[in-house]
């Protein structure tokens, strides 16, 4: 494998390093989540999904002396959340699907496939009916290189960016971008496909 200060490359996968489990830091974050939930109307359901990244799910690709502590972090958060919060645990589901490309090879984000697999778990947990809807995955870019590639200077690999859309959907929705004071009828910003960071196609970025 190849190693740099920014990221590591193991078995053709760029994997960012992770901080070791810090109980004090995680406890503070968990308290903030509980505080938020306490200020939400009692009739509003609060659901929380903590998503592991590639270093944890692809742990089998790491050298024997490199271990992930994300499971410890997730268990701590789960055990210390208030009863008002439903914790949706997708860790095992993602682990069970490691044969699929759950995370980009050149970026720290998960792929549309990874997000979709987690969504199915979330939908079951909160009672959403997804059986009546079929989805299609469509490639919108085949030359994506993410921040992991930029950070370590390895540009020999490319990722496909796919979007997921309901098949034969008759529904409609509006995405309200509060900070930009604009509304759109789509989750995708196709203008971003002409930029270097094609991941911005999803709602224009963070």
List the model feature ranges, each with a label.
Residues 114-206:
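Extracellular/periplasmic envelope-modification machinery, especially enzymes
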Residues 9, 56-59, 96:
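Short active-site-adjacent helix-start/loop capping segments
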Residues 103-106:
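Catalytic core of nucleotide-activated saccharide and alditol-phosphate transferases
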């Amino acid at each position: 494998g190849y190693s740099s200060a920014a990221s590591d490359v193991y078995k053709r996968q760029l994997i960012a390093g992770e901080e070791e489990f810090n109980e004090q830091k995680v406890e503070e974050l968990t308290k903030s989540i509980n505080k938020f939930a306490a200020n939400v109307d009692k009739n509003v359901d609060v659901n929380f999904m903590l998503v592991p990244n590639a270093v944890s799910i692809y742990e089998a690709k790491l050298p024997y002396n490199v271990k992930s502590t994300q499971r410890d972090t997730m268990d701590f958060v789960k055990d210390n959340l208030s009863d008002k919060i439903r914790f949706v645990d997708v860790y095992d589901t993602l682990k069970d699907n490691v044969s699929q490309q759950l995370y980009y090879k050149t970026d720290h984000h998960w792929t549309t496939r990874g997000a979709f697999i987690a969504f199915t778990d979330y939908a079951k947990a909160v009672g959403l009916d997804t059986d009546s809807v079929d989805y299609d995955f469509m490639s919108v870019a085949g030359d994506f290189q993410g921040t992991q590639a930029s950070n370590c200077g390895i540009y020999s690999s490319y990722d496909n960016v796919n979007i997921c859309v309901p098949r034969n959907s008759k529904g409609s929705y509006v995405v309200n971008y509060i900070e930009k004071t604009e509304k759109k009828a789509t989750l995708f910003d196709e203008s971003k496909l002409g930029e270097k960071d094609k991941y911005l196609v999803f709602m224009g970025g963070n």
